Amino acid sequence: MNWLLRKCSKCGRYTLSRDRCPYCGGELIVPHPPRFSPIDKYVEYRLEEKLSKGIIKLDEKPPYKP
């Protein structure tokens, strides 16, 4: 999808320019989040990455006890 709005990574201002920020000359990024899909093709890769970095640990007991 072709987004028009851009955000400067340096100063945080929004602009319609596509190359550089007209205020500070910083790099522009697309501020829109990625589309959500219930059929996620990359969930396995994200889970594997989080497990390898130790963000998620599957061997721990959950804190909730019914």
UniProtKB/Swiss-Prot annotation:
Q: Any S-S bridges, and between which cysteines?
A: none
Keyword annotations from UniProtKB, A to Z: Ribonucleoprotein, Ribosome biogenesis, rRNA processing
Q: Name one Pfam family in it.
A: Nop10p
> Single GO molecular-function term?
snoRNA binding
Q: Which domain of life is it from?
A: Archaea
Which SUPFAM superfamilies would you find in this protein's record? Nop10-like SnoRNP (SSF144210)
Keyword ATP-binding attributed? no
- Give the matching InterPro entries: H/ACA_rnp_Nop10, H/ACA_rnp_Nop10_sf, Nop10_arc-typ
GO biological-process terms attached to the record:
pseudouridine synthesis; rRNA processing
Q: Which GO terms describe its cellular component?
A: ribonucleoprotein complex
Keyword Transport in the entry? The reply is: no
Entry function: Involved in ribosome biogenesis; more specifically in 18S rRNA pseudouridylation and in cleavage of pre-rRNA.
NCBIfam families on file: PRK13130.1 (NF009623)
The text of the family note is: Belongs to the NOP10 family.
Q: What is this protein called?
A: Ribosome biogenesis protein Nop10
Naturally occurring in which organism (per UniProt): Desulfurococcus amylolyticus (strain DSM 18924 / JCM 16383 / VKM B-2413 / 1221n)
Q: Which classification does the entry list for the species? A: Archaea, Thermoproteota, Thermoprotei, Desulfurococcales, Desulfurococcaceae
